[in-house]
Amino acid sequence: MINNAARSLLCEQFIANNTIDPKLYDRYVVKRGLRNSDGTGVMAGLTNICNVHGYVVNEGEKSPIQGQLIFRGYNINDLVSNAQKENRFGYEEIVYLLLMGDLPNREELTAFKGMMAENRPLPDNFFEDMILKAPSKNIMNKMARAILALYSYDDNPENRSPEYEMATAISIISKLPNIMVSAYQVKKRCYDGESLFMHPLIPTHSTAEMILSALRPDRQFTEEEAKILDLLLMLHAEHGGGNNSTFACRVLTSSGTDPYSAYSAAIGSLKGPRHGGANLKVAAMHQCIKDNVQNWEDEGEIADFLTKILNKEAFDHTGLVYGMGHAVYTLSDPRAVILRENAKKMAENTEFEREYKLLEAVERLTPELFKKIKGSDKAMCANVDMYSGFVYSMLGIPEDLYTPMFAVSRMAGWCAHRFEELVTGKRIIRPAYKAVSVEKKYIPLDER
């Protein structure tokens, strides 16, 4: 172990030699974060899988519009509303759509659900060897390690045939919820001192039902609870090729590596607080607001505290209202709109109704306060994180699983993008970095 003094000295040297003058980025016209100056993403590829539409550009000017999320040509609003109209679970249909490119008929969907049920169980001794014997405080870390470990249980993991890739994708999508719940139960036992319980899987369960059944000691849940969790899985399943985790998956895929490595990297990306981990920031901020606003129905008091947050005087002092704003969406995030409507219905006449109204007030008040305090006319809307954590809390799902739930859902999108990259990519993704270091003459060791 490095002592504190040595560590501090090394860190000073590390920081000094790894800092680049910000002016150089402008001089060499570097698109930092692969973003254009107006915040839009640099065009790095083409995709048939998903369209995330939040603005239009007219004569070089970015104009805000109502957001649209389209999976394989189908609007997310239509996919959700039809599943609800027919009173059935929709996530498995979304998975099929993303992987295969079109909607299944009844027979195809039934067969596909059967494939997912068959693939949910973990390999023999996997739970004991890979999860129970090596617990992790962070479930995302454990999920990434578990996906990598599945490579060793595969008879032919370097096979790149379409048949193998499809079978592996269905296997991983099906197993990941089981891995998540298993890792969480072990974490509770090893780090929280709670009892460990593992329920046998029920083959007829949907993905949402399987998760709720596995998490609860008595296995009991209502249809309303399972349907709103299914809705969350649908909304998080895919979001274009440019988001960090999907791009990471495509970057690794372009190198020719195996699917386990590519999907594990995507989980590692989603774990980051600037990406999937942002939902934990939203939950923490909401708790801070609840603790500091005495009257949740007083919009003036709510606005005063939001002003403190925006002025970097409260919460984490970053000046950010988490859950508000998005890199693409401007006037609305369709996922947030759908989730807000369903969260409202679920919260009505329950202990959660007051909290829902508080979140609604935060969403309504923040854009004008942001404009007033920051002096910006930038369009701002609530993103899906504004209400996802709230719905998870109504379901009794712990914060430890907020981002892992995101990963469970998004695995379908990652798999679809890997397929597309394998079929159409044909070259390794390799952007350029300009060296700005100064040439130095080597100094012999004794003369330094």
Where are these regions (language model features)?
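Non-transmembrane, aqueous-exposed alpha-helical and coiled segments at domain scale
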Residues: 1-448
